[in-house]
Amino acid sequence: MRYSLFLEFFFVFVLTCSLDVICYKRTSSLNLVTDIKQIKNKSIHKRNRLYSSNENLKRLKYIREVTNASIQVCNDALKECNNDVDKAIELVRKNTKNGSFISTSVKTQKEGLICSDIMDDKIVLIELLTDSDFVARNNKFVTFLKNISKLCLHNEIIPPNIDVNDSVENFDTSLVAIDKIMQSPYTNSNGEINGTVSEELNYLRNIFREDIKIGRFSKYIKKNENEFLHYYIHNIVDGNNVGLSGVMLVIEIDNLNEKLKTKEKDIISFANDLCMHIISAKPVSVSIDKVNQNVVKKEMDIIRDSLKDLNKPENIITNMINGKMKKFYSNVVLLEQEYMLDDTKRKVSQVIKDFSKNNDLTINVKHFDNFIVGEKNILV
C-alpha cells in the first residue's frame, strides 16, 4: 500500500515538472519570437528613418548649393514648403536681402559619358548615364554610346512636326527624341543590326546590374550654308569625341566657305575657346531674348518679393528690379557673361566683336548645348 502510494506521488511529481518545463519552453519561445519581431520592427524603423534622413540631407544640400543660405534657413524653408525643393528655393530667395542665384548648376548622383558626332550639315550631342565610374569606363559602355551617337547622326530621330533645332531646354523634344532612339534598330561596330537600341540597353543593364539610361540628347541641322558646326569634349575618355563634358556650338559666319579657305584654323580655335567658356560659365541661353519667359517672370517675382519690405517708391523698386535682372542675365546669358579665358573683363559679345574685327569676319552665335555628367542646370 505504501509502495503504491509512493509511486502515485512520484508519477504526479514527474508529470507536474514536465508540464512546467513545456510551459516554460513555450513561453520562452513566444518571448523569443516577440523579441525578434520587435528587433525587426526597430531595424525597419531605423532604416526608414535613415533613408528619410538621407533624402532630407540631399534636399538641404541642393537648396544650400543654389542659394548659399544657412542650413537652418534651408531646413525651415523645406519644412514650410512640405519638402517641395523648388518652392523652398523660392522662399529662401524671397526672404533673403540678396535673392540672386549663387549657382544655377547643381550636382547629381550619376556617372556616365558625353559623346558628340558631326557630319556635313548635322551635329549631335548625347549623354549616357549609369551608377558607377567603373561601368562608365568599360569598353562595352563606351562602344554602345558611340554607336547610338552615330545612329542619331544618320537617322531622323525627331519627328517632322517638331523643330529639330529646338534646344535641349525643350524637355518634351528631348523626351520624344529619346523614345525614338530607344525604338531604333541598333547597329553594332561591325555594321550588323542586333535588335533595337532598347534591347541592347537592357542587355548592358543585365551584364552590369546598373541603371544605364540615355540622359540628354540634342541634334542640330544647318539652316543655311553659313552656319559652322563645332563640338568640344572636355576630359576626354576615348578618341576625341567621348568625355565627361561636351558642348555643341553653332556659329554663323558671312561667306563661310570663302573664309574657311584662309581662316579655318582661326575659326576652329575661336570656336574651341567659346566652348571652353561655355563649359566653365554654364550659360542657359545665347541672348536675353532667348531666355525662357517663364524663368524671367519667376525671377522678377522673386526679386520683387525680396524688396517688398523696403517701403520705396515704385519707380525706385522698378529700377532695383532692373538692376538685379541685369545681374541675373550676366550670370546666365552667354553674350552677357564676362569672358572667362582671359582677364580683360570683356563681355563675350565684345570678345566676338573683337575677334571678328581682327579677322575680317562677321560672327553670330546661333545655338549651343552644354552637357556635363553629374550636373544639371536648374533653369533648364
Swiss-Prot record:
What further fact does the record state?
A: This protein may be expected to contain an N-terminal transit peptide but none has been predicted.
Protein name stated in the entry: Elongation factor Ts, mitochondrial
Highest taxon in the source lineage: Eukaryota
Gene3D superfamilies with a match to the protein in the record: 1.10.286.20, DNA helicase RuvA subunit, C-terminal domain, Elongation factor Ts, dimerisation domain
Where, subcellularly, is it found?
Mitochondrion
| InterPro entries for this protein | EF-Ts_dimer_sf, Transl_elong_EFTs/EF1B, Transl_elong_EFTs/EF1B_dimer, UBA-like_sf
One GO MF term on file is:
translation elongation factor activity
One cellular component (GO) term of this entry: mitochondrion
GO term, biological process aspect, one = mitochondrial translational elongation
Q: Which family does it belong to?
A: Belongs to the EF-Ts family.
Q: Which Pfam families match?
A: EF_TS
Query: Major location, coarse class?
Result: mitochondrion
**Function recorded in the entry:** Associates with the EF-Tu.GDP complex and induces the exchange of GDP to GTP. It remains bound to the aminoacyl-tRNA.EF-Tu.GTP complex up to the GTP hydrolysis stage on the ribosome.
Q: Which UniProt keywords apply?
A: Elongation factor, Mitochondrion, Protein biosynthesis
